[in-house]
């Protein structure tokens, strides 16, 4: 560890500082203000003749990103969470002895505390003239080169801390993510929703069709499943009397990784008694309008080279109409299992003959429709067979009162009128068990306690989930989900695999 020559040289400098009575890792150094505050507060000097205010004695801190020795003076650029600032000091300003120590031992990557006044250099750059410079933290590992930086995309994700040091834009993206979560939370609180927390480890893998992560509870001697979705617990709360609840938290799915999928991801799920899925679509449009406004994005944004118009109302189209309009498929084809199988095979897609009509229609949707839905589009009235927790339509028993929101070819939200008939729910679970026994690893399992909860009576309720990671991707124009997750899942390095062997 820390055994290359550059790291060893830095370690020796840290030792030398200790020998001089300077702790390279002091316990506490207090800064007075951020670099942004310093710039804003003292920008008035730009309008003065002298271009300086020596009556100021402000204390700031930051990481050294640039260090340049010019004769008997040192220019440096420090950076904090928000911005950067040039600092300047010389033998006269900090003292000859300290200057010599700093000149020899300060390096790019070190974190320093600086006290001084604002001034403008001869080249016109707003700067801080330092009277004190204290080492706050000695960096042992050198930063990547400024102009080449951390260019290996895999390394950026594996060493996010370095990525954040080198790329201010990365920090800005995660500030946007944090703001999005905060805005969503306050939006629902202002609507009268109650934020709750439900279990992350479930006795039954349920709430969505997905393959779970399995763990073991040593004390209880039983298997547990990391949460696929919080849905069934949140609906239990509606049964219990809370009429509007939401949860922002992690979900886990033991499936593949790609540009839009990470094994652990963040969602908001919310349930609203005495409302229907049309109310949810209206609420979702209102939420997007708020986010775009608060993030100063306007009603039209760019994502992956495409312009997306968020003007209300969003398009609403039935599942079957979308197959015809966007998929270019004939109405008689989408209602005929054999014709669907033939179409899929001819076009080179996998076609499982054991699937029922609703699942085959879903194959058509995935292959012919989804990528064409660019502007926000609510696709409504899904096949009941792929909607095991949704309420049946009163007009057509094969249709679920369900929608999904698609933007730029990706699903962003899923909502429906909740199934509150316990007998119907029990039968749906039995069909899911049949599907699982037939080889569908993602089929739901029976949850008799949930059915029992419905037996006590759940009021008419609508519920929805929104993937926050994909939402942030959209709002920051990022193609990969790993760009909006601080520490995304990564495949093990070969060296890590060898160590395990």
Swiss-Prot record:
Source superkingdom: Bacteria
Binding residues for Mg(2+) 1: 404, 411
EC number: 6.1.1.6
Entry keyword set: Aminoacyl-tRNA synthetase, ATP-binding, Cytoplasm, Ligase, Magnesium, Metal-binding, Nucleotide-binding, Protein biosynthesis
Gene Ontology MF annotations: ATP binding; lysine-tRNA ligase activity; magnesium ion binding; tRNA binding
Residues annotated as binding Mg(2+) 2: 411
Reactions that this protein is recorded to catalyse: tRNA(Lys) + L-lysine + ATP = L-lysyl-tRNA(Lys) + AMP + diphosphate
InterPro entries noted in UniProt: Aa-tRNA-synt_II, aa-tRNA-synth_II, aa-tRNA-synth_II/BPL/LPL, Lys-tRNA-ligase_II, Lys-tRNA-ligase_II_N, Lys-tRNA-synth_II_C, NA-bd_OB-fold, NA-bd_OB_tRNA
Cofactor needs: Mg(2+)
PROSITE patterns: AA_TRNA_LIGASE_II (PS50862)
Gene3D superfamilies: Bira Bifunctional Protein, Domain 2 (3.30.930.10), Nucleic acid-binding proteins (2.40.50.140)
One BP annotation, GO: lysyl-tRNA aminoacylation
PANTHER family referenced in this protein's UniProt entry, alphabetically: LYSINE--TRNA LIGASE, CHLOROPLASTIC_MITOCHONDRIAL, LYSYL-TRNA SYNTHETASE
Oligomeric and partner information: Homodimer.
Protein name: Lysine--tRNA ligase
Gene encoding the protein: lysS
